Curated annotation (Swiss-Prot):
The modification Phosphoserine is found at residue 25. The keyword Phosphoprotein applies. It comes from Homo sapiens (Human). This is Tropomodulin-2. Pfam families: Tropomodulin. One of its GO terms (cellular component) is striated muscle thin filament. Neuronal-tissue specific. Belongs to the tropomodulin family. The keyword RNA-binding does not apply.
Amino acid sequence: MALPFQKELEKYKNIDEDELLGKLSEEELKQLENVLDDLDPESAMLPAGFRQKDQTQKAATGPFDREHLLMYLEKEALEQKDREDFVPFTGEKKGRVFIPKEKPIETRKEEKVTLDPELEEALASASDTELYDLAAVLGVHNLLNNPKFDEETANNKGGKGPVRNVVKGEKVKPVFEEPPNPTNVEISLQQMKANDPSLQEVNLNNIKNIPIPTLREFAKALETNTHVKKFSLAATRSNDPVAIAFADMLKVNKTLTSLNIESNFITGTGILALVEALKENDTLTEIKIDNQRQQLGTAVEMEIAQMLEENSRILKFGYQFTKQGPRTRVAAAITKNNDLVRKKRVEADRR
């Protein structure tokens, strides 16, 4: 089922992009480059040969045709003759011929084991099934599948077939891939802007084709929304501008209690903006920022630890610290905040 915005994009399929770009001025082209940098900061959607920007503004000194150059190089390579060997190869072998040493054959000596008379009598009178069970308990699994042992047991039983005591393994349960996120981005954004009371949780996880401006609109809509309590945008290719937009939202929003921005492209700059915003927020109790594309660094982790020590409302903080100092401080701060909530709950129950 095609989404509404996908239907609108169909009318742009037959547009000549080269003609449109040729009509743009230099200033308009620079503005377009800035917009593309915001949409794709890592240039992951471009081929590897086009990710490097121009390093100079100088005009070309002569015409350059890449296809013509490749054809010329290929033609020159085919026309040039191979260089003849000055010293022909005669096949003469020099030096000693490597002969591997023969390893001595190891012979195993059987150790004689003497058992108690009671054990020998018990083993002599044991049935084949009991011997199989004993071999399984002792871990002698090669004995269970040994054909010689099967022949001996069959002969001892008067020509009957061997006893099979094979443990069958459990069937492997198939693991199916998770279905795509069914959240409709446009409808959710419209509901948030309209402050729909039925929308209390928004889940945009793993939707990788959401434009950066649309994610900013979500943050802008949360500034005035009074019903959404949980918002999650993990693995949506969000970057620092998105994190800064959500930081501005946290300074104003008084309803949101949980925010998840894990597995994105946010650097220390965006995380520091969120940390500063949490100092002015009184409602958020859970935030997850782990698994970003690059490590945040010691300075950012120390700022996070200081913020959590001063914030008594955050009960869950999703981040794996790389340094022992900030990790210990954050663990103590989170434990203290949860103890305060527990004490308030106990006092309320007593009343």
